[in-house]
Amino acid sequence: MSTLASSASVFLVHPPLPPSPPQAGNHSYLTTLGFGYSIAIALGFLVLLSTVLLSSYICCRDSRRRTTAVESTGDRGGSVILPRIIFVAEEDNEDLEAGDVVVGLDQAVINSYPKFHFSKDTSAASSDGFGGGGDTTCSICLCEYKEAEMLRMMPECKHYFHLCCLDAWLKLNGSCPVCRNSPLPTPTSTPLSTPLSEVVPLSQYAADRRRARR
C-alpha cells in the first residue's frame, strides 16, 4: 500500500500559474511620450505658420517700397527741372570782337525808367494798340502779372515787364526784349542783343511765381 501511494504521488499535475498583471510604469511612460510628441508637433506648426506670415509681411513691405520709389522717380522724371540761373553772359570779352560786345545799361539809367504797380483796370485802359498797353504777361519770364505787382516800363516803346526781370535784362542788353528798340543815345543802330546761347530765360523765377500763386 505504501508503494502505491508513493507512486501515485509522482503523477500529480500542478495547475498553471495565472498571468502577472501589467505594470503601471510602462503605461505612464507611453502616455507621457505621446503627449510630448503632440506638443512638439503643435510647436512646429506654430513656428512654420509664424515663418510664413513673417515672410509674407516682408515681401509685401518691400514691394510697397519699390512701388513708392518708382512712382516718386516717375514724378521727378516727368517734371522739368528748371535752372536757377537768371542770365548767363560771357564775362571775358577779350576774345570778342568790338562789334560783338554785349551792350548793357548802368543801374542808374535803369532806375530812371518809369515804374508802376500793375492793375487790370489800368492795363485795360491803356490797351490802345500802342506799345505794351493791355499786356497781362511778362515777355521775359512768361508769368502773368499779379494785382499791385511792381512793373517797369521802357520809356520809348512803352512795353512793360516785371521790374526785376527788366532790370536783369537791361544789365546785359540795352534794347527792349519785345521790339528791340534801344533808348541809348548812340549814333549807331540798335545794339546787338545777347546771343541766345549765352542767355538763360527766367524759368526758375517763373516757376517760383506759379508756386506762390497756388
From Swiss-Prot:
Pfam families recorded: zf-RING_2
GO biological process terms held by the UniProt record: protein ubiquitination
UniProt remark on domains: The RING-type zinc finger domain mediates binding to an E2 ubiquitin-conjugating enzyme.
Example of a GO cellular component annotation carried by this entry: membrane
Signal peptide, first to last residue: none
Keywords linked to the UniProt accession: Membrane, Metal-binding, Transferase, Transmembrane, Transmembrane helix, Ubl conjugation pathway, Zinc, Zinc-finger
Catalytic activity: S-ubiquitinyl-[E2 ubiquitin-conjugating enzyme]-L-cysteine + [acceptor protein]-L-lysine = [E2 ubiquitin-conjugating enzyme]-L-cysteine + N(6)-ubiquitinyl-[acceptor protein]-L-lysine
Membrane-related topology note: Single-pass membrane protein
Enzyme's top EC category: transferase
Pathway the protein takes part in: Protein modification; protein ubiquitination
Species for this entry: Arabidopsis thaliana (Mouse-ear cress)
Family membership: Belongs to the RING-type zinc finger family. ATL subfamily.
Zinc finger (RING-type): 138-180
The UniProt record lists the keyword Cell membrane: no
Compartment(s) where it occurs, according to its Swiss-Prot or TrEMBL record: Membrane
Gene: ATL67
UniProt GO molecular function: transferase activity; zinc ion binding
Transmembrane segments: 33-53
Protein name (record): RING-H2 finger protein ATL67
EC number assigned by the record: 2.3.2.27
